[in-house]
Structures are given as structure tokens and as C-alpha cells.
Curated annotation (Swiss-Prot):
<dbReference type="GO" id="GO:0005737">
    <property type="term" value="C:cytoplasm"/>
</dbReference>
<dbReference type="InterPro" id="IPR016181">
    <property type="entry name" value="Acyl_CoA_acyltransferase"/>
</dbReference>
<dbReference type="Pfam" id="PF04377">
    <property type="entry name" value="ATE_C"/>
</dbReference>
<comment type="similarity">
    <text>Belongs to the R-transferase family. Bpt subfamily.</text>
</comment>
<protein>
    <recommendedName>
        <fullName>Aspartate/glutamate leucyltransferase</fullName>
        <ecNumber>2.3.2.29</ecNumber>
    </recommendedName>
</protein>
<dbReference type="InterPro" id="IPR017138">
    <property type="entry name" value="Asp_Glu_LeuTrfase"/>
</dbReference>
<dbReference type="InterPro" id="IPR007471">
    <property type="entry name" value="N-end_Aminoacyl_Trfase_N"/>
</dbReference>
<comment type="function">
    <text>Functions in the N-end rule pathway of protein degradation where it conjugates Leu from its aminoacyl-tRNA to the N-termini of proteins containing an N-terminal aspartate or glutamate.</text>
</comment>
<dbReference type="GO" id="GO:0008914">
    <property type="term" value="F:leucyl-tRNA--protein transferase activity"/>
</dbReference>
<keyword id="KW-0963">Cytoplasm</keyword>
<dbReference type="InterPro" id="IPR030700">
    <property type="entry name" value="N-end_Aminoacyl_Trfase"/>
</dbReference>
<keyword id="KW-0808">Transferase</keyword>
<dbReference type="Pfam" id="PF04376">
    <property type="entry name" value="ATE_N"/>
</dbReference>
<dbReference type="InterPro" id="IPR007472">
    <property type="entry name" value="N-end_Aminoacyl_Trfase_C"/>
</dbReference>
<dbReference type="GO" id="GO:0071596">
    <property type="term" value="P:ubiquitin-dependent protein catabolic process via the N-end rule pathway"/>
</dbReference>
<keyword id="KW-0012">Acyltransferase</keyword>
<dbReference type="GO" id="GO:0004057">
    <property type="term" value="F:arginyl-tRNA--protein transferase activity"/>
</dbReference>
Length: 249
């Protein structure tokens, strides 16, 4: 009898490099490739185990001395907006989010570059070309989608042709137990809208509507100001040695 080899993922470890979140720390990552007809199933399992996806790679921190990166997921069904979040939601009621296949566009890239140049000029993604951006969006074997946020036009209820300018984008994986926000960006010239917060709130509502219990936000890094926003969306769960544990803030 001939046995077909199982499509088990192989894991690799990166060399140490400077941590982008905590000064003076070194980071290492364990990663595997998400390829083949089991990629979607493997991505679900790994995300539930604290991994994140970038293109066709799933990774998680494997640092030698630091454990500051904590996987976070929102309990969508129990979530209630704070007063400030309700204000953000109301302030963006003129927006419409449309779901598309994970395909890049020149309009998306222009917004992406505007976002990076204004907010992450010295970050690791600052030199990404249009080809790099295209690979980030479409180089995947998993169930993912693009959500484009635009101002509603007078005919938006009939057709997307009536929508206004593109002001925010989210790349989102659709999993068996939730939505995973892989990457999002927005116009840096509309700070009063709090678009980052709005997109998370919108994903919570989308998860609820689809009957999905979780919205995965990636890593909260204690001590990193840029990651502090993630723990405002409660109740949520944090992944630790004993599995997912409830966190109320």
C-alpha cells in the first residue's frame, strides 16, 4: 500500500534582530509557509495558536528572554462600545465598507504610501514598492479579502460607482471562528475620524453579523505605546501558557 505524505507544516527560526517595539530588545520569530490545499485550515489553527499571517507565511514571536508580545482577540458577541467609541462610530456613519477579492489597485497603493510616509516613515515597510504592496495583498493561499472604506455617495445604495474617495483599507482573513485583521491603513489627513478605531468597530459588527465569535487583532506589546490601543476593545482574550484567558481591562 502506498501512503501519501501528510502536508504537515515545517517550522523555521529567524536569527535575532532588533525589536521594532521595545528598545534594547532582540526579537526572533518561528515561521512556516502557508501553501497547498490545507493552507486555509493550517492558517486557522495557527492563528488560534498565536500566529500572524504575512503573505504566505505564518509567524509568531520566539524571543529568548522577552514575552511581551501577547496575542489578542476580541469577544465580538459580548463587546459593547464605550462612549468615545460610539462617538467614533457616529462620526463615520457617512462611510461605506465594501468587501472585495484580495486584489491590489493603484488607488490603494497611493493611500498606503500616504499612510506610511505620514505615520511610519522609518518603519520596516517604509520602502515598499507597488510590487511589494501587490504581493502583500494577493500572495496568499488562504481565505482573505479587502474591505475598502469610502464616503457614501447619493447612489451608493444602488451601485459602488457612486461611492466617494478611498479613505481606509483593511486586509482581513476570514476564519472558521472569526475575522483576523492582517493589515489596515487609512488617510493620515483625517485624524478627527479615528479611522483605525472605526475599522476595528466595523470588523466587530461584521463578525457579529456572520455569527463569528472573535476578531483577532494580532499582538499587544506591553510597554509599547503604539500597541496600547488594542486593549481598549473589551471584553477580549489574551493567549498565555494556559490558553486563551479572559481580559476585561
Amino acid at each position: 500500500m502506498t501512503h501519501q505524505p501528510q502536508q504537515s507544516p515545517q517550522f523555521f527560526l529567524t536569527a535575532p534582530s532588533p525589536c521594532p517595539y521595545l528598545e534594547g530588545q532582540q526579537e526572533r520569530k518561528v515561521f512556516t509557509h502557508l501553501v497547498g490545499d490545507k493552507a486555509n485550515e493550517i492558517n486557522d489553527l495557527l492563528t488560534q495558536g498565536g500566529f500572524r499571517r504575512s503573505q504566505n507565511i505564518a509567524y509568531r514571536p520566539a524571543c529568548e528572554v522577552c514575552r511581551a508580545c501577547i496575542s489578542v482577540r476580541i469577544l465580538a458577541g459580548e463587546f459593547e462600545m464605550t462612549r468615545n467609541m460610539r462617538r467614533v462610530w457616529s462620526q463615520n456613519r457617512d462611510l461605506i465598507g465594501r468587501v472585495h477579492k484580495a486584489q491590489p489597485s493603484t488607488e490603494q497603493y497611493a493611500l498606503f504610501r500616504d499612510y506610511l510616509d505620514a505615520r511610519h516613515r522609518s518603519g520596516g515597510m517604509s520602502d515598499m514598492t507597488v510590487l511589494d504592496y501587490a504581493m502583500m495583498i494577493e500572495d496568499t493561499h488562504v481565505n482573505t479579502q479587502i474591505i475598502e472604506y469610502r464616503r457614501r455617495g447619493p447612489d451608493s445604495f444602488m451601485s459602488a460607482k457612486g461611492d466617494g474617495e478611498l479613505i481606509a483599507v483593511a486586509l482581513t482573513d476570514v476564519m472558521a471562528d472569526g475575522l483576523s485583521m492582517v493589515y489596515s491603513f487609512f488617510s493620515p489627513h483625517m485624524q478627527e475620524r479615528s479611522l483605525g478605531t472605526y475599522m476595528i468597530l466595523d470588523h466587530i459588527e461584521r463578525a457579529r453579523a456572520a455569527g463569528l465569535p472573535h476578531v483577532y487583532l494580532g499582538y499587544w506589546v506591553e510597554g509599547s505605546r503604539k500597541m496600547q490601543y488594542k486593549i481598549r476593545f473589551t471584553p477580549q482574550e489574551h493567549l498565555g501558557p494556559r490558553g486563551w484567558q479572559r481580559f476585561e481591562g
